Amino acid sequence: MPILPVPALNALLTKTIKTIKTGAAKNAHQHHVLHHTLKGLDNLPAPVLERINRRLKASTAEQYPLADAHLRLILAISNKLKRPLAIDKLPKLRQKFGTDAVSLQAPSVWQQNADASGSTENAVSWQDKTIANADGGDMTVRCYQKSTQNSERKSTDEAAMLFFHGGGFCIGDIDTHHEFCHTVCAQTGWAVVSVDYRMAPEYPAPTALKDCLAAYAWLAEHSQSLGASPSRIVLSGDSAGGCLAALVAQQVIKPIDALWQDNNQAPAADKKVNDTFKNSLADLPRPLAQLPLYPVTDYEAEYPSWELYGEGLLLDHNDAEVFNSAYTQHSGLPQSHPLISVMHGDNTQLCPSYIVVAELDILRDEGLAYAELLQKEGVQVQTYTVLGAPHGFINLMSVHQGLGNQTTYIINEFACLVQNLLTSEGDKPNLRA
């Protein structure tokens, strides 16, 4: 296919960005416009990509030596699409982020549900279920299962992943992270349950954590219907979801009394509902392992990565401050409280952890600090830094080949960790200590 002249490519990109930014493409997410546009750019020669980058004033190879021209162009386009963030704009941003995130995903991960008979090796089916949140209301979870090619009875002793989406505790949903959960299920064969927890500012901390704990209790009770064992639940999440995964791991093992208190400055919860939630967490099996991806871990200390990568990338200083404020300012809890900050919780009995950070990420160093803390506590921990990657890279897994390969590698490594744990422990009962 002939390559358009650079000015024509610029015009095409400008038109695409404008269409998405203004919402003129009403159903852009359904047609996966961003996916096809950004993935297609990788077919251009590197010199052409660099010329476009210069015109768009993208970051340079000198600034980010391990980020290739294609990725730097994706970041430049993302910056063009980005709008200033403020707490009162979060509801609108939530809708736009949802549309853009789905538009980035490969169409195939949305089509395979219609062909879930197992005719393809990695066919995955999913179903949305309504369960009770921590306050007795409705909450949606999306359950993924790898389709079987025969009618044999499914095993009930496999691992299952409970996944919490990222988005600063304020944006994101089960659709925005559908591609990653679908991929984990296809690649590992595990059931995956993605949680649509309540978000700030409407529901400040620790509501999201309580909902995630309610989802954990539900999965422990219903795991066998998904072909999994309650003693083989693994936790994962990205960014804010990575924080929630770590907090859930802490609280399942050793819950603290503040979980049962009304900290949201809302009308007091019905005592019966509160008791039901408390009782649901009694004697839960502890998680087998956790996979926090570029997690939020520390709300108080500042790290070098805050200065190095605080501007011009997918998550900047202002974004982090707005998200943090929306999540914590009406919580009635200090930011150092163990229901908010994993660095201040009890990590002494935490499950084995595989902690992933991104090199070009404002949160990189606090993720590494969390891993170091776990090591000091005697927890089995592995870390992996994705070089040249920005915050939120799993949302780019199907538009950038390198990030897709890295995501595949991370899933494989975590699956190996889980398998090694099962082999070494002989699947002994895994109840709270």
From Swiss-Prot:
One of its GO terms (molecular function) is triacylglycerol lipase activity. The keyword Lipid metabolism applies. Active at temperatures close to 0 degree Celsius. It catalyses: a triacylglycerol + H2O = a diacylglycerol + a fatty acid + H(+). Pfam families: Abhydrolase_3. A motif (Involved in the stabilization of the negatively charged intermediate by the formation of the oxyanion hole) lies at residues 165-167. One of its GO terms (biological process) is lipid catabolic process. Its EC number is 3.1.1.3. SUPFAM superfamilies: alpha/beta-Hydrolases (SSF53474). Gene3D superfamilies: alpha/beta hydrolase. The active site is at residues 239, 361, 391. Keywords: Hydrolase, Lipid degradation, Lipid metabolism. It is an enzyme of class 3 (hydrolase). The keyword Lipid metabolism applies. It comes from the Bacteria. Belongs to the 'GDXG' lipolytic enzyme family. This is Lipase 2. It comes from Moraxella sp. (strain TA144). The lineage of its organism: Bacteria, Pseudomonadati, Pseudomonadota, Gammaproteobacteria, Moraxellales. The gene is lip2.
